Amino acid sequence: MEAPAARLFLLLLLGTWAPAPGSASSEAPPLINEDVKRTVDLSSHLAKVTAEVVLAHLGGGSTSRATSFLLALEPELEARLAHLGVQVKGEDEEENNLEVRETKIKGKSGRFFTVRLPVALDPGAKISVIVETVYTHVLQPYPTQITQSEKQFVVFEGNHYFYSPYPTKTQTMRVKLASRNVESYTKLGNPTRSEDLLDYGPFRDVPAYSQDTFKVHYENNSPFLTITSMTRVIEVSHWGNIAVEENVDLKHTGAVLKGPFSRYDYQRQPDSGISSIRSFKTILPAAAQDVYYRDEIGNVSTSHLLILDDSVEMEIRPRFPLFGGWKTHYIVGYNLPSYEYLYNLGDQYALKMRFVDHVFDEQVIDSLTVKIILPEGAKNIEIDSPYEISRAPDELHYTYLDTFGRPVIVAYKKNLVEQHIQDIVVHYTFNKVLMLQEPLLVVAAFYILFFTVIIYVRLDFSITKDPAAEARMKVACITEQVLTLVNKRIGLYRHFDETVNRYKQSRDISTLNSGKKSLETEHKALTSEIALLQSRLKTEGSDLCDRVSEMQKLDAQVKELVLKSAVEAERLVAGKLKKDTYIENEKLISGKRQELVTKIDHILDAL
């Protein structure tokens, strides 16, 4: 096709489109793909297509500058698109991703996107851009069923040409496969094959919207692992912690296992179940702690955790290997310090976290639901996302000490890949006074509890009063006090016995005198208290008064014996009494004292 004819054809074609945003004229500027180098990566279960496009402004009498250009996707692949990104070649990827917006072209099928250029393109000027697309579920297993010992083969169908609304002068295509074992592939333009690479082209003067089926059938044993459903829950606490939990449903979407599964062959033969999945690695944030991994049965102990400088690597090994068509479900959770992800200025808060995190290499997520539980009282909630997400109505979540519920943001998205591992920012306002709500609730709850107990024990809930029962309760209370005082008085005697023994060893008369004085003082006080309690028993008309009186008399005799024992010890130390005589006298005193104490014990038991 000659150049003037090509330009005329292009102008007629572009005349049916709406003008590009920012165009100076009512007609779209005439553009052409001067050179296209496509790379189709089929080495995993994803189809990654990267195109380096040299876009040229033809001019052709038009003085309008091009501020944007159009991208098109084949109707056969448009439904499988997971990611589309465009950037200027040679510039930093993160800072120079171009703005892409979906649009429609009247009379044309497929999906179209408008890409805004960083700088308007003058007539005759050129710009090199890189277009990256990722497709999911486009590699179809063929055969669809295999045995445990067979290898997996897949079929991919695409386009030999770069599908574009603009004509293309020259283009090439390189296909990277998962292995060198290729059953068949299309032969358009006599492609060259080297190991696991197929090279097509160059194709010259390709008209716009050109399509020619490209098909390849080859061996691909990479893990066809797909997350069919995933729920990611992020619970934010202003007390320093962010809890993350992920509920994951996994499925092997490769060729379905045909026939029985042999664990013996699987362990013995290295190539048995070569396309199955034994384990995979999940990358958690570097600050992750308290990590757990469980399924429906419980904790799975076959997992391993490796803490690195910039991440935490978790090897997840399901309870059984995954073959084609097999499914499993598991839960992973961990805690994060909030100071790394939560920022605030006054009452303004911003939570910056990933919408989806790394689950495994070359991940595919069919359906993702993200729930972000904010603190109770959060208001004016807004979300900034690097890509389009859908929002469901906000929910309320109730947990300990909540009164009106915590707001829950519910967002979801379908067909996600690794390129979607990006941060979202949740903005909200929160009155810091509300942080005192839960501590005050705890204090109030304990106050009410103690106050209720106090009131309860002081109230009389009996229907009729029983004077006899009240009298018995009073007598029992007085008796309990008498028992306590008697035990203390017996303890005084034992303490004085120890003082006498120390005196016999040290011969220090001051020690003995001090012990006597202490015994007299404390014994007098205890005896007086018991006498008062005895009078109260008499007032209540209890017959226990006589028993207490008898016990007092017996105690007086015990005291005399205790003091007599001290006198004997003084005579022994002074040399006025022989040791043999002292031992005989001490035996007599101890025997009488034991008889008296036994009688007192009987009286106490009767009380």
UniProtKB/Swiss-Prot annotation:
Subunit of the oligosaccharyl transferase (OST) complex that catalyzes the initial transfer of a defined glycan (Glc(3)Man(9)GlcNAc(2) in eukaryotes) from the lipid carrier dolichol-pyrophosphate to an asparagine residue within an Asn-X-Ser/Thr consensus motif in nascent polypeptide chains, the first step in protein N-glycosylation. N-glycosylation occurs cotranslationally and the complex associates with the Sec61 complex at the channel-forming translocon complex that mediates protein translocation across the endoplasmic reticulum (ER). All subunits are required for a maximal enzyme activity. Residues 456-607 are cytoplasmic. The gene is RPN1. Its main location: endoplasmic reticulum. Glycans are attached at residue 299. This is Dolichyl-diphosphooligosaccharide--protein glycosyltransferase subunit 1. The modification N6-acetyllysine is found at residues 187, 538. Component of the oligosaccharyltransferase (OST) complex. OST exists in two different complex forms which contain common core subunits RPN1, RPN2, OST48, OST4, DAD1 and TMEM258, either STT3A or STT3B as catalytic subunits, and form-specific accessory subunits. STT3A complex assembly occurs through the formation of 3 subcomplexes. Subcomplex 1 contains RPN1 and TMEM258, subcomplex 2 contains the STT3A-specific subunits STT3A, DC2/OSTC, and KCP2 as well as the core subunit OST4, and subcomplex 3 contains RPN2, DAD1, and OST48. Belongs to the OST1 family. The chain crosses the membrane at residues 435-455. Ubiquitinated by the ECS(ASB11) complex. Ufmylated by UFL1 in response to endoplasmic reticulum stress, promoting reticulophagy of endoplasmic reticulum sheets. Keywords: Acetylation, Endoplasmic reticulum, Glycoprotein, Isopeptide bond, Membrane, Signal, Transmembrane, Transmembrane helix, Ubl conjugation. There is a cross-link at residue 538 (Glycyl lysine isopeptide (Lys-Gly) (interchain with G-Cter in SUMO2)). InterPro entries: Ribophorin_I (IPR007676). It is found in: Endoplasmic reticulum membrane. PANTHER family: DOLICHYL-DIPHOSPHOOLIGOSACCHARIDE--PROTEIN GLYCOSYLTRANSFERASE SUBUNIT 1, RIBOPHORIN I. Residues 1-23 form the signal peptide. Residues 24-434 are lumenal. One of its GO terms (cellular component) is oligosaccharyltransferase complex. Pathway: Protein modification; protein glycosylation. The keyword Ubl conjugation applies. GO terms for biological process: protein N-linked glycosylation via asparagine. It is a single-pass type I membrane protein.
